[in-house]
């Protein structure tokens, strides 16, 4: 969960909805690892995270970044897409009774193929 705050050190801003999300996750039984709100560098750098928060639940760098606001997510997505050299798949919107796959007019053929593959993948459990 990416935020301007580190594990609640700022009471306001984007950390508040992310703390709510963490509380909801903590109530469930999940087979994936997650951690409370933190700066992006802390999420991606396990050594930094271990120094700042030795009792954190994560091992290794985060492979999913969650943001409270779409403008922050979009900015980071574009930076990573341009500088990271990785493969972008998404965005995928969830929580509307089913998945929605959103593509931009500038999507590549490969990007559209990736989204089609995800759209055709059955969901074992949704909700």
Please name every model-derived segment.
Residues 1-11, 20, 24, 46, ...:
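C-terminal functional extensions of proteins
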Residues 4-64:
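Active-site rim loops that border cofactor/substrate pockets in soluble metabolic enzymes
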Residues 46-49, 81-85:
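Short amphipathic alpha-helical surface micro-motifs
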Residues 63-83:
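C-terminal hydrophobic structural anchor segments
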Residues 36, 68, 104:
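Pocket-edge structural micro-motifs
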